[in-house]
Amino acid sequence: MLNRILEPEVMDTAEEAVDYDRMDHSHVNRLFVDDFLLALTDANGLGNQPCCVFDAGTGTAQIPIELMQRKFPGTVVASDLAQAMLVVARQNVQAAGLQDSIELVLRDCKQLPELDATYHAVMSNSIVHHIPEPRDVLRELWRVLKPGGVLFVRDLMRPGDIDSLNHLVRTYAGEANDHQQKMFRESLHAALTVSEVREILVELGISTDSVKATSDRHWTISARKT
């Protein structure tokens, strides 16, 4: 098993933000939104009523934009710790004409200022692998979720060996530039395994059945707070 090698917590240069935004995340983002909406629908129809969603680690806001373009009947508070990402996110939100539906905020998701039980749903795509102590983020995301709400977190899954990692880079970033390939490689090294996520869920009192491997490179938590 590959050891976890941490990468920088914040991608806060203009080059990183622009390179990240230019990578083709469209298929992954569509699947994320499909699955998030399904999770809300399964939770007593949350996806069909106005609600406020918190997006942790929004990056350049591609997923909130995809969500709102599906005519989602709610709003999104989209957060990131990187100012450079939020600059690009603001441009993307304005270009999509979604300023009234998506609020961009600077947040450290390890220490959120929000009160307990603030949001109807919390979603996050690929923030966990950036965090040295991922339980800190997952604890906060669970805390700000209302009872009855849905926590939906998806992230990269660390492969078992270097050959598998190299295969994933070739498969999913083979046509990317050198910097983009480097970012993807480092993210895979920094990612958690499903068993490591389950250990954290036990500590937080969240069902371990809520996390599953959902692709050859992703795990997903889908949990309803009682």
PLM features: residue spans?
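Conserved alpha-helix/loop element of class I SAM-dependent methyltransferases that forms part
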Residues: 26-49
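Class I SAM-dependent methyltransferase SAM/SAH-binding core
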Residues: 54-56, 61-111
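A short acidic, Gly/Pro-enriched loop at the edge of an enzyme's catalytic core
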Residues: 110-121
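A short SAM/SAH-binding and catalytic strip from SAM-dependent methyltransferases
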Residues: 121-133
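A short glycine-rich, Lys/Arg-flanked "PGG" loop and its adjoining helix->strand segment in the class I
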Residues: 136-147
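Conserved beta-strand signature within the Rossmann-like core of class I S-adenosyl-L-methionine
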Residues: 149-155
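C-terminal alpha-helical "lid/dimerization" subdomain adjacent to the S-adenosyl-L-methionine
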Residues: 156-204, 209-213, 218-219
